[in-house]
A protein has these predicted regions:
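Acidic/His- and Gly-rich active-site-bordering loop/insert found
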Residues: 1-105, 124-130, 309
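Predominant activation on well-ordered alpha-helical scaffold segments within soluble catalytic domains
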Residues: 10, 36, 115-118, 122, ...
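Solvent-exposed residues in well-ordered beta-strands and their adjoining turns
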Residues: 62, 191-195, 312-314
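Short pre-catalytic strand/loop immediately N-terminal to key active-site residues, enriched for Gly-Thr
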Residues: 98-109, 373-377
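Fold-level recognition of mixed alpha/beta catalytic cores in primary-metabolism enzymes, strongest
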Residues: 99, 107-267, 273-282, 393, ...
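An extended, acidic, His-containing surface patch that forms the Zn2+-binding/catalytic region
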Residues: 172-173, 228-296, 300-304, 315-325, ...
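Oligomerization/assembly interface segments of phage tail-like spikes and tubes
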Residues: 188-191, 303-311
Length: 440
């Protein structure tokens, strides 16, 4: 491909920076070094900061002319494992263009999108026209659940006027979206014991506790009824605005998304209320249950059963309050005689971005100029810990991007529309120019 950015992006893509695999620790470090060197080549300062887990990339590209507002840029250079390799139609770490798409692991999540954001800043700096200070604050463990970037931001008192993250996408091609809310997450491991050992079902069945029965009874206390969680798990929800609700009508219908995913709706109105349920409401899911033996023909009462479950918190909810409510409901529902152990493995609060913030309005103007239409304001069903961390500092965050539902993020043949790279560069450049109007 003859585009001038292709070879440069291909260099970054070529580094197999899989943060979840200890065997790729050197590659993760190499990707971090690549990004720092990119900032330095653009005339900025940058360093790779080691941590207890994966490194951070911290740097700054100064505005071309004196005092200017500061834009914090976040992205991640680590990627998901490429497995299963036999399903890829090209080498996962070799950038390839075909049929109008760019294929490679990380091209959409998030190397390609982060590159667009930084390349646009570098081009403006080279022309002496960068109107903002670009503070690079990136990590290499987003795909493995790290928290170093959040800890770093908590300790950094410099502040910023706005943060920009290109690590998202749009539901429909040509219809950009800004995420103004992210859901939080609390993840639990539950162990339930009913005695000292497995028991003969012919001797003790219907008289002694069965750990599998007891666990399913316990879990039922926190599961939704017709898609609605128990009231203690709904406390604090900030409902979507009228503008957000109106925007859902422009998105791909929920029934279509469920069908394309090969999924079936869980409740009667689930498809109709897809965006409400997946972005603006809390959701609790059981991810795995272990107990007894589903393979061997054993006639026993299992003495122990385990489960993993998580709750996605809606914007506005307090993670400590909701996590405590989950544990309380589980303990109250456990049958008498059962021993229940509940361990919270991780948690992160939800985030809200004020859509009327001046920086957000300027960003909407920038996208409207390059896309020819104003972005929709939506919420993300996922969890992005950096958003509430920035909100704690009073920094509004612009979360957007160029991935599509068919970009195969986290799957074989990950891809990004090739035309979205030059469009993204133009849009990011316009974004910096508009944000330069902020009072620094």
């Amino acid at each position: 491909m003859a585009e001038p950015w292709f070879d440069e992006l291909a260099e970054l893509i070529r580094i197999p920076s899989v943060s979840a695999d200890p065997g790729h620790a050197g590659d993760v470090r190499a990707a971090a070094e690549w990004l720092a060197e990119f900032v330095r080549r653009a005339g900025g300062a940058a360093e790779v900061v080691p941590t207890d887990t994966q490194p951070l990339i911290i740097g700054e590209l100064a505005a071309s002319n004196g005092s200017a507002p500061t834009v914090l840029v976040y992205g991640h250079v680590d990627v998901q494992p490429p497995d299963p390799l036999d399903l890829w139609e090209s080498e996962p770490f070799s950038l390839e263009e075909r049929d109008g798409w760019l294929y490679a692991r990380g091209v959409a999540d998030d190397k390609g999108q982060l590159y667009i954001l930084l390349k646009a800043a570098a081009d403006l700096a080279a022309a002496g026209e960068l109107p903002v200070n670009v503070r690079v604050t990136c990590d290499a463990e987003e795909e493995s659940g790290g928290h170093q970037i959040v800890d770093y931001l908590a300790a950094d008192d410099r502040g910023a006027d706005v943060a920009v993250i290109f690590d998202s996408g749009m539901t429909k091609q040509g219809v950009p979206e800004f995420n103004v809310g992210t859901r939080g997450l609390a993840y639990f491991h539950v162990v339930l014991r009913t005695g000292m050992r497995d028991l003969h079902s012919g001797v003790y069945g219907n008289a002694a506790l069965n750990a599998m029965h007891a666990l399913t009874e316990t879990l039922a206390a926190v599961l939704p009824r017709d898609g609605v969680l128990p009231e203690p798990l709904r406390e604090g929800i900030v409902p979507p605005t009228d503008e957000e609700i109106a925007g859902w009508a422009e998105l791909v219908p929920g029934a279509e998304l469920l069908s394309e995913a090969g999924a079936r709706q869980a409740y009667q109105r689930a498809a109709e209320e897809f965006y409400l349920r997946t972005t603006a409401e809390p959701a609790l899911d059981v991810h795995g249950i272990v107990g007894g033996s589903p393979v061997l023909q054993k006639t026993v009462l299992p003495v122990e059963a385990e489960a993993n479950l998580s709750i996605r918190l809606a914007p506005g909810q307090d993670v400590e309050t909701i996590a405590a409510a989950v544990e309380r409901l589980l303990r109250e529902a456990a049958p008498d005689g059962a021993e229940l152990e509940v361990t919270r493995l991780s948690s992160s609060p939800p985030g809200l971005v004020p859509p009327d913030a001046p920086a957000v309005q300027l960003a909407l103007d920038a996208f409207e100029k390059t896309f020819g239409r104003r972005p929709l304001l939506v919420r993300s069903g996922g969890t992005l810990p950096i958003v509430p961390a920035l909100a704690e500092k009073g920094i509004p965050t612009i979360i957007t991007g160029f991935a599509l539902p068919e970009s195969n993020i986290h799957s074989p043949n990950e891809r990004l529309l090739a035309e979205y790279v030059p469009l993204g560069l133009e849009t990011a450049g316009e974004l910096y120019k508009r944000l330069g109007e902020l009072d620094g």
